Amino acid sequence: MIKTELESERNTNRKALRAGINVLVALIGLLISAGPALSENASDWITGLPREPIHVQAWPKGKKVAVCFILYVEVWGFGHGPNFRPDTAARDPDVVDESFRQYAIYWGIPRVGRLFNEQALPLSIALNAAFPEEHPDVWQQFRSLVPKAPIIAHGINNSTELLPLGRGLDAQKAYIQRTLDLIEKGTGVRSRGWTSPSVYPNADTFTATAAQGISYSLDAMDSDVLSRLATKSGPLVLIPYPVVAVDMGHYLERSKDPSDMERLWTDYVTELARDAADPDREATVIAIGIHPFVVGTPAGAAALRRVLENLKKQELVWVTDVQAVLDAMGENP
């Protein structure tokens, strides 16, 4: 009698558990399916402005993951910039850290240019406006290696002349205008893309860039897909630039070697490709920030070369540049 009652109670509990699991699975399914719909008319969390995804089913030749490597060509100035050895930063002169920065300019930037030239792969350039004038020989040598690389405006420099945040929209417009004018003077190219110096914009920056003729920005770090921000000055395409894929933070703040970045980049893109292999999923895009301090050393270039060679073999991966992405989605600034 007691045994029968226990078995009956167990059966009842099993049925209740199965019912509960079924309800939970159904709720999860609803949340997953609702995700894209919820994001269709979302407000951007930085600006509060309307932001919507840009739907791309596939890139050219059926590729599903667009990968844009962005080399940051920057001016820091003597006594400024990233420190390889924080324990020597108080020295005057700080020979260790100044050498770290100078090597990146004179040896690292050309080495990265040679690598992409040898691999016959596109590169995009994020350029501080002061660089061509301050380092004309380096700029000319580098540009000759990647003459078709799109130039993305990256402010005046990366230390003493950043965006005038907190001084109003007009001040930012003037700064952006000056940046674009200087880049055009030094390169002959009028940039249509923007990435804020030191990754430090605010809500006004997006409207200010659009007002000055910028059509796309890398200041969005929170997505796998393209999106469009409706600024007060006009639409602005946001190209995903995930913070976890930028080399310098990992290298300096987390003590990761170039070989660690090799594994991270390969895994990141490979997993995006695995996701995108589902025909019901849309195409994705990632802009990967690289710096000559990291990938411009011999060890860094060797690691990056292995990444590029790996990505070239992946059927669904398209290594490209930002302009080609815009062209492919129908945005031709």
Label every PLM stretch briefly.
Residues 50-52, 146, 216, 266-333:
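C-terminal domain-boundary segment and adjacent tail
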Residues 1-18:
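N-terminal secretory signal peptides that target proteins for export/translocation
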Residues 41-61, 181-185, 189-281:
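Active-site-adjacent pocket scaffolds in enzyme catalytic domains
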Residues 167-174, 256-260, 299, 303:
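Alpha-helix N-cap and loop-to-helix initiation/capping positions
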Residues 42-148, 307-310, 316:
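Active-site beta->alpha N-cap acidic-glycine motif
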Residues 37-39:
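Boundary at the C-terminal end of the N-terminal hydrophobic targeting segment
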Residues 91-93, 110-113, 118-202, 234-235, ...:
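Metal-dependent polysaccharide deacetylase catalytic core of the NodB/CE4 family, i.e.
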Residues 22-33:
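Bacterial N-terminal signal peptides
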